[in-house]
Amino acid sequence: MPSERCLSIQEMLTGQRLCHSESHNDSVLAALNQQRSDGILCDITLIAEEQKFHAHKAVLAACSDYFRAMFSLCMVESGADEVNLHGVTSLGLKQALEFAYTGQILLEPGVIQDVLAAGSHLQLLELLNLCSHYLIQELNSFNYLDLYRLADLFNLTLLEKAVIDFLVKHLSELLKSRPEEVLTLPYCLLQEVLKSDRLTSLSEEQIWQLAVRWLEHNCHYQYMDELLQYIRFGLMDVDTLHTVALSHPLVQASETATALVNEALEYHQSIYAQPVWQTRRTKPRFQSDTLYIIGGKKREVCKVKELRYFNPVDQENALIAAIANWSELAPMPVGRSHHCVAVMGDFLFVAGGEVEHASGRTCAVRTACRYDPRSNSWAEIAPMKNCREHFVLGAMEEYLYAVGGRNELRQVLPTVERYCPKKNKWTFVQSFDRSLSCHAGYVADGLLWISGGVTNTAQYQNRLMVYEPNQNKWISRSPMLQRRVYHSMAAVQRKLYVLGGNDLDYNNDRILVRHIDSYNIDTDQWTRCNFNLLTGQNESGVAVHNGRIYLVGGYSIWTNEPLACIQVLDVSREGKEEVFYGPTLPFASNGIAACFLPAPYFTCPNLQTLQVPHHRIGTI
């Protein structure tokens, strides 16, 4: 029999694979460290305070730009067997070398300053980063000033920011427990603290008083004009501006300070124009944005006047008792539902809606009001020209726009009107080409977008229209994939999303729409998303924050009941979109409105960054 040919290894195997050893890097570094300890195969000796340390040039150059330049450029030390290091202690160099060869270091109070000096001198950036994190963990009310000086000396930006954040958070406590120390703060540190939006533990009057005391301490008057720029005089009331600020000798002696106070007084005199006159000196300080809910209609048919915000201070019980996390603010002058809200310059505007009269009859109104988060108060503004409910209100640049809706006679309107805060006046602009109500709208890309709705002949719409304010005209865009009424619309990045609402089936009966459709503003194209609402929602409020769309309350045509749920659509990560339930409303409500505004610091000064709890259903 003929002998079988033996196959070579190369012929038996196919393909190629990249193989990786997880222990190789560590074992090589460990071997180099052992060589350093034994003093073998080393090619450089470093000397600090007459103490010698053996090392490898390649290892040092890989860790430090300082050594890379020393050993690779035409420097005297590049060919030397020994290098004397000045400005580095032997203890600091020992610790730095230990880190270079192991990636670890034991930091403690007795060595930290030597390690910082060595890390800074030798440009061991990762070592300095570890030192910063160690010092941040040690930061407290007794050492914050010393740690700031260390951060400044060694250019530790992470530590410097941590000290600023610590002071912003604890300034009120420090003024009570260590007031004299606060008055010795370096100017650069105080400046960063006073300019912070998160300095909410003190009133603006208290911040002003601190600035004055600091200026008078050791006569720091050369900083006065610049420092007073960080006082938000517009947040003080008129009486305070007159009695505390304008009459103060420091203000009277400074043209800049006088101008700042007069600017604030002029701001207060122009009550209606304040939203479009916002500057850094009139903007409220706040810890974070949070979700607000306004008005609505309860099961008992009564109209709600309350303004509430979600207060996530109590994170421990947030998932279990989310209702308890809603806090009340000053209520609206009158309860209303199916109204609209818009935010301009951190002021909340409420317009139109349906109100309940003493006779029990309900009808649409034209009234409008404005909420001031600085004083937790409401003010009436000029009423709209038309009574409106089931309409759209949007803020663009310096104007509000009210679009369509139903009037007090339940007639569907084609009209559009614009509100000018400076004049406190509404004027008509270009109307629709047809009457429309129960539509949805949102401002995106500097334009007002309107989708769906129902006409005065009860025709459900799938149209998408956009209003161009500069040309005062409506432009038709690609229609939605299906008709929707009582739905919601929101924008994230350059996409519009339509959610909820209902349509009509072949028998002309209403059906819930759980599909979510998105519209690409750049391509004028609609796409059906591969994720749906968990339950249908009509007549809901809608708000957007950090790539998440919040669908608030509403009505279910399945149960004929108002809803207390909040559904959250997270579209912040493309391909990983998610729909889940957020916190429960304090009561079931339809015709409710929602928005995001700065959290009110006068009721919760230590409110942390918003983390709305949710019951995660799972990634879609």
Curated annotation (Swiss-Prot):
It comes from the Eukaryota. Disulfide bonds: none annotated. PROSITE patterns: BTB. Kelch repeats lie at residues 290-346, 347-398, 399-446, 447-494, 496-547, 549-599. Pfam families: BACK (PF07707), Beta-prop_ATRN-LZTR1 (PF24981), BTB (PF00651). Residues 42-109 form the BTB domain. Keywords: Kelch repeat, Repeat. This is Kelch-like protein 32.
